[in-house]
Each structure stands twice: as C-alpha cells, then as structure tokens.
C-alpha cells in the first residue's frame, strides 16, 4: 500500500550532495513472506513488511519491520495499517531532516515499535543518500564492521555443539547466544556444559531465557552453570515481573540483560535505576536509529553495557543493525547478534551480506547502502 502527495520530482543522481529536496512525498508498505531454511515447530516463514520512503528529490529510503505479535502485539496487517492510516499522513510533506519533528508526531501513537522503527530508518537512509555518506558515519563513524554472535536454538546438546562448530568453521563466529528457558532447567544446563566442554575457552557463551523461567528457576539454573564462564544472562524471567527480576539481579554475579523489558528510553531508566538489569539489549528493529541512539547515550551516562540484539531480522534489517552498531565504541565492544538472516533460505538484497572471519562489514555506500531486488520482492510479497 502507498500513501503519497502529488509533487514534481527531479533526478537525485544530478543533485549535489546535501541539496536534494528531502520533502517526503510517498510512504509505501509491502508485506512479504520468506521461507526459513532451518524451520522448526510452528515457525516456517519470516513475515516482514518492507517500508519505502520517497522524497521530492527522487531519493528512496528502505527498511523492514519484523512483527512479533506475541511480544509487541504487532502483525503484518497492523504495521501496514498504522503506517498508511496514521504515520504516513503525519510525515508527508515534511523534510526528512526534521527528525525531531517527525519523532514527536510518531510518538503521539502508543505502541507499534517496529512500524515506527522501520519508518525512522528509511528516513535516515534517505538522509545518508542526500549527503552522499553512509548512515554509520552520520551516526558516529566509529568502525566499519562488527563482530558477530550466533544464536543457538533449542536442541539436544550434540546438535547444538554441531551447529556451533559449523558456524565457527564456516563463518569464523566464536560468540554464541544460547537459548534457554525450558523445564526442567537441567535440559539447558546440559547444553551449555556440552558447549563449554567442547570448545573450552575458545568461544564466548551467554544465555537468553526469552522470559521462560521464574526468578527461582533462573537462580537455580545460573547457580548450576556458575562454572561455565557465561558472560551475560538475558531476560530469563517475565518482562512484567519487575520485582522478580530485581531479586534475580541481586542473587547472581552474571550481568543481567534487559531486552523485552526495556524497549523504550523510559523503560531503560526504570530497569537500570530500579536494579532490575545490569545491561541493555538495543534492537534497531524496534527503536530505529533515533531511539536506539537515545538509549545508547542513556546507558553510556549510567555506565551500563549494551549489546546489539536481533529480531529475526532479514538482511535488510541486519544491514540497519550493523550500521548502527558499528557507529559507536560502546556498541562494538561486544559481538552483535547479526546472523539470524542465515536461517532464511533467500532474501531481498541484490548483494547479499557476507559474514567473514567472524565479522560483518557495513556497506560503504551512502545511506544504509543496500539495494532491494525488485524481482525477489515481487516473488515474496503477499496480499493481506
């Protein structure tokens, strides 16, 4: 679907950097469905929404919104609806450089984090193109790449060791995020122990509970893994159990990461000052570049670590995540969760992302620096 205003357009290719007309003239939303190469359970496809912004100067910015209905309440249909009915009318006719003005308009509507984030990043893509600079440089320009971590899903210990070994030998990845939260918790303890025994000190391991355990279960599980040198423990308990998570932080020496419980700057303040977390997961898929930057600077001011997270991002979403993560010293200190796109059997970019020697480089081209393959987009798009 498309929301647009009439305008006369000039070619962006003939404009001097910084002189293109950045007035937003059109916002397009295209839902699409891509198959997962390693599907399990009830999840066999990734259902995202491509968000495309056009300007009077002929520039086109893109980003993707990956809905997580059981976490944020968004679906493909809701993302398309809120952008076309509320957000697009609010930004049409506005200069893409007026980021605070646009942000204030989007903020009037509660929720809808990935819809807001995708629109925000598409606008940043336009701005980078207009000035002929990569978004990474506009944001901070600290590095041109990030180390990559890989998520290991639920399986038996041998299978997860094999998967980790494949990732290390094929892509050079040596940091692994292990999904935990099963009952009995010994199932996950056995997996983490098998990984540590197989790799020794050659890899970094941390765990993510996806809110699956009670505080007491989480404490017992972490006690059972105390000798495995886990570097982080992410969202082991329900996101709304503030007191339970606060209790857990006091009972473990492993730094506790807030993810789903800290999705806005206000929630980050609550989690850190209230003692419910020691570190914060930043996901550009839900906070875009604008709010991700706010959260990062909050954490820097409070002396709190950050990790770049992932939301089943495709290659377009991953390009956005690495663009932000590479821009700052604080976000490059830990490996970023930038490998989920490997679970997808196909994607939308004309030049696929490449993980080499355990790192993912940013594109050196202006904006986010990627191009959507229109044939693939047409193949995977769906009608709602």
Regions found by a protein language model. Name each.
Residues 21, 26, 54-130:
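Metal- or metallocofactor-binding catalytic centers and their adjacent structured scaffolds
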Residues 229, 240-255, 262-359:
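Shared catalytic-loop signature of beta/alpha-barrel
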Residues 51, 58, 87, 119, ...:
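Conserved, mostly hydrophobic/aromatic
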Residues 343-384:
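C-terminal extensions of enzymes
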Residues 14-26, 40-42, 107, 128-129, ...:
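N-terminal amphipathic alpha-helix/helix-capping segment at the start of soluble metabolic enzymes
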Residues 137-252:
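Metal-dependent enolase-superfamily TIM-barrel catalytic cores that perform enediolate-based chemistry
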